[in-house]
């Protein structure tokens, strides 16, 4: 991404929602942006796998995991799948695992923390629903921009491809 989130905030403050600063970088790509696809779940990453199995086409998967600190919702295998399928990044309101391996994968990954335990796989979760966490509300089709300084979300694309 050629335009930093700080510049987007300077130029488009009225059009942006800025996430509270609680996310850490884990992926091999720190700067990423794209249209949003959402999943909402709790301690079951089946919907994450389902989404990342599809062609990403430069999208960002926003995972509302309820902020759980009891298991990981993304690891190296799912991140590699997302990278292979053309996703720009994943933002997890929850934990990830395999952090050393995640750092080697060319995919943006931001999450609250790490946890070694994998999630359950019961197939429970919602797709393309409105989610609210980190002080903002996000809808499928919004545009997310992430870099070293934070995460901002807009209703429409703010940068030229």
Curated annotation (Swiss-Prot):
Signal peptide per UniProt: none
- From the UniProt record, list the reaction(s) this protein catalyses: 4-hydroxy-4-methyl-2-oxoglutarate = 2 pyruvate; oxaloacetate + H(+) = pyruvate + CO2
User: Know the name of this protein?
Assistant: Putative 4-hydroxy-4-methyl-2-oxoglutarate aldolase
E.C. number(s) listed in UniProt: 4.1.3.17, 4.1.1.112
Q: Name one GO molecular function term.
A: 4-hydroxy-4-methyl-2-oxoglutarate aldolase activity
Cofactor(s) needed, names only, are:
a divalent metal cation
The record, for SUPFAM superfamilies, names: RraA-like (SSF89562)
Q: Taxonomic lineage per UniProt?
A: Bacteria, Pseudomonadati, Pseudomonadota, Gammaproteobacteria, Chromatiales
Q: Where does a divalent metal cation bind?
A: 98
Name its species.
Answer: Alkalilimnicola ehrlichii (strain ATCC BAA-1101 / DSM 17681 / MLHE-1)
By its UniProt entry, which Pfam families does this protein fall under? RraA-like
- Biological role: Catalyzes the aldol cleavage of 4-hydroxy-4-methyl-2-oxoglutarate (HMG) into 2 molecules of pyruvate. Also contains a secondary oxaloacetate (OAA) decarboxylase activity due to the common pyruvate enolate transition state formed following C-C bond cleavage in the retro-aldol and decarboxylation reactions.
Q: Which residues bind substrate?
A: 75-78, 97
Provide the alphabetized UniProt keywords: Lyase, Metal-binding
Q: Which domain of life is it from?
A: Bacteria
Q: How is the cofactor bound?
A: Divalent metal cation.
- Alphabetically, which GO biological process terms does the record hold? regulation of RNA metabolic process
Report the InterPro entries cross-referenced here: RraA, RraA/RraA-like, RraA/RraA-like_sf
What is the main EC category here? lyase
Q: Which NCBIfam families match?
A: NOT-MenG (TIGR01935), PRK09372.1 (NF006875)
The record lists the membrane-crossing segments as none
Q: Tell me its family.
A: Belongs to the class II aldolase/RraA-like family.
Subunit relationships: Homotrimer.
């Amino acid at each position: 991404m050629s335009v930093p989130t700080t510049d987007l905030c300077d130029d488009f403050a009225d059009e942006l929602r800025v996430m509270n600063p609680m996310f850490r970088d884990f992926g091999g790509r720190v700067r990423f942006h794209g249209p949003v696809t959402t999943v909402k779940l709790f301690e079951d990453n089946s919907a994450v796998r389902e989404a990342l199995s599809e062609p990403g086409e430069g999208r960002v998967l926003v995972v509302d995991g309820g902020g759980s600190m009891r298991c990981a919702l993304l690891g190296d295998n799912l991140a590699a799948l997302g990278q292979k399928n053309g996703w720009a990044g994943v933002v997890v309101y929850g934990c990830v695992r395999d952090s050393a391996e995640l750092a080697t994968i060319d995919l943006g990954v931001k999450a609250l923390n790490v946890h070694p335990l994998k999630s359950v796989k019961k197939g429970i979760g919602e797709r393309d629903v409105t989610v609210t966490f980190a002080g903002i509300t996000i809808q499928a089709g919004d545009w997310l921009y992430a870099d070293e300084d934070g995460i901002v979300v807009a209703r429409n694309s703010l940068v030229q491809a």
